[in-house]
């Protein structure tokens, strides 16, 4: 069996994984990275799923199973739960990122220090086939191609 350093296992919940048959005609595709290491991670991901399903600005196309993996950066913390979500939207990249940051606050994210434990971390990993780099928004996300927490879940959708 293949063993990847830091990777523990995949888990499922009510909405992770999820695959939609109903595709609407939104302008853009976006890949969102989800992360959490403050309990209850699964419940929080499912709550975010419901909130985004009810938000008319988005159509969720699919989600990955949840990957349990070791923390990186600041290692003296609980393992992380990570997943990816593929959505459709008419929002531009910066506007979408603003909504994601709002959701982090709504789910009580506190930014105490770099790589600190978090209730919810939402990253805009990819946005259609666009490349955008400014002080507010970087797409593709700088860690998207290297992080196991993105690569393995992405391979599951």
UniProtKB/Swiss-Prot annotation:
It holds the Pfam family HPPK. CDD domains: HPPK. Its EC number is 2.7.6.3. The keyword ATP-binding applies. Belongs to the HPPK family. It comes from Campylobacter jejuni subsp. jejuni serotype O:2 (strain ATCC 700819 / NCTC 11168). The gene is folK. InterPro entries: Hppk, Hppk_sf. This is 2-amino-4-hydroxy-6-hydroxymethyldihydropteridine pyrophosphokinase. GO terms for biological process: folic acid biosynthetic process; tetrahydrofolate biosynthetic process. It comes from the Bacteria. Keywords: ATP-binding, Folate biosynthesis, Kinase, Nucleotide-binding, Transferase. Pathway: Cofactor biosynthesis; tetrahydrofolate biosynthesis; 2-amino-4-hydroxy-6-hydroxymethyl-7,8-dihydropteridine diphosphate from 7,8-dihydroneopterin triphosphate: step 4/4. GO terms for molecular function: 2-amino-4-hydroxy-6-hydroxymethyldihydropteridine diphosphokinase activity; ATP binding; kinase activity. It is an enzyme of class 2 (transferase). Catalyzes the transfer of pyrophosphate from adenosine triphosphate (ATP) to 6-hydroxymethyl-7,8-dihydropterin, an enzymatic step in folate biosynthesis pathway. It catalyses: 6-hydroxymethyl-7,8-dihydropterin + ATP = (7,8-dihydropterin-6-yl)methyl diphosphate + AMP + H(+). The keyword Transferase applies.
């Amino acid at each position: 069996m293949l063993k990847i350093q830091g990777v523990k296992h995949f888990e499922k919940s009510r909405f992770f994984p999820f695959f939609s048959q109903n595709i609407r005609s939104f302008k853009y595709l976006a890949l969102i990275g989800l992360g959490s290491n403050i309990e209850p991670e699964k419940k929080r991901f499912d709550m975010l799923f419901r909130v985004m399903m009810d938000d008319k600005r988005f159509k969720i196309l699919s989600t990955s199973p949840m990957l349990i993996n070791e923390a990186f950066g600041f290692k003296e913390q609980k393992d992380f739960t990570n997943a990816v979500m593929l959505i459709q939207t008419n929002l531009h990249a910066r506007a979408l990122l603003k909504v994601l940051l709002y959701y982090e606050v709504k789910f009580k994210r506190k930014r105490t220090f770099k790589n600190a434990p978090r209730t919810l971390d939402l990253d805009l990993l990819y946005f259609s086939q666009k490349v955008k780099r400014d002080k507010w928004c970087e797409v593709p996300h700088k860690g998207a191609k290297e992080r196991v927490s993105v690569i393995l879940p992405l391979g599951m959708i």
